[in-house]
Amino acid sequence: MEPVGRKRSRKAAKAQLEAQVTAAQGATKEGSGIASNFPGQPTMEPVGRKRSRKAAKAQLEAQVRAAPAKKHTGKDPVRDECEERNPFTETREEDVTDEHGEREPFAEKDEHTGIHTMKLEHIAADIKKGLAAKREMIKIDKAAYRKTKNTIERALKKKQLKRQKRDYRHTRKLLNVLKEYIAEKQKDDEAEEAEAAAAAAEAAAAAEAAAAAAEVIVVEDEEEEEKEEEEEKEEEEEEGEEEGGGEEGEEGGGGGEGEETEEEEEEEEEEEEEEQIKAFQEKQKRWQQPTGVRSWRLREMKPLLEQLLKAAKDTKDNYCIISSSEESELDN
């Protein structure tokens, strides 16, 4: 399908040629002196002239048909056809005339194609302006996004730094409190241990004194018993000498009763010593119980203290790293 402009140009050229032919025919009619044989009818032209006019008309039509072929010689027919069919490459600068050879008035839009006749340069300029505006908007959006992102990151870093500082202060305070508590606890334990040792020494001394006193008492009792036995023996000997053999039997029975009383006294003394030893052992156990509990508590507190010291050291290292990074950012 050919473009509309070319069709019109061909029609205009054809109409112009027909007008020239009719003008030539009129000139021949006026110049011929042959009258018409019928009234009211034009004069007949000679046969030779008719043939010459037909030949001239055919020649002109052949020239008109050959004109587009000459125009497109040396071009790619497929590409040329695409260019002819492309409505965006057409312009209104072609010579557009109607069938009577008059130029049609210029219109904003082509009635047949419906394509805006604005120049491609203006369209390209508008497209470039729109793209430039879009690029500027994208740049502005990117700058605003970076700014907000940096502000948010700074706020988060400040918040994290404050939190770490607060944790570091609390850990330091807790460490000081724990150290003071452990020191006081150790002092109390040492004082209690000293008191317990002094009490144990006193109890041991008292037990030794009691044992020594008991031994002295036992020795004195034994000495007294020996004296009494000697006196009794002397008395018995004297009585035996006086009274004779019957009384000797009675003296033997009295000696057996004295031995039984001595055995009972020894058993009572042993029981008293055992009771004193048991009481002393119970007192030692009572004194040793609080010291054992305190030592157990101290053993439990030591690993907790070590863990706390380790955590404080880690927080201190983190605080130093963050403060150094913040200083470097401020320098940059």
Swiss-Prot record:
Low complexity: bias regions: 196-217
Main subcellular location of this protein, as a coarse class: nucleus
Domain of life: Eukaryota
InterPro entries the record matches: XLR/SYCP3
Expression sites (tissue/organ): Expressed exclusively in testis.
Subcellular location: Nucleus, Nucleolus
Residue stretches of biased makeup (Acidic residues): 218-275
Listed GO biological process terms: meiotic cell cycle; spermatid development
Comp. bias intervals (Basic residues): 1-13
Bias type Basic and acidic residues, positions: 74-91, 98-114, 276-285
Renumbered residue ranges of the record's region Disordered: 1-114, 186-293
Keyword match rRNA-binding: no
UniProt keyword annotations, A-Z: Nucleus
Homology family: Belongs to the XLR/SYCP3 family.
Protein name: Protein FAM9A
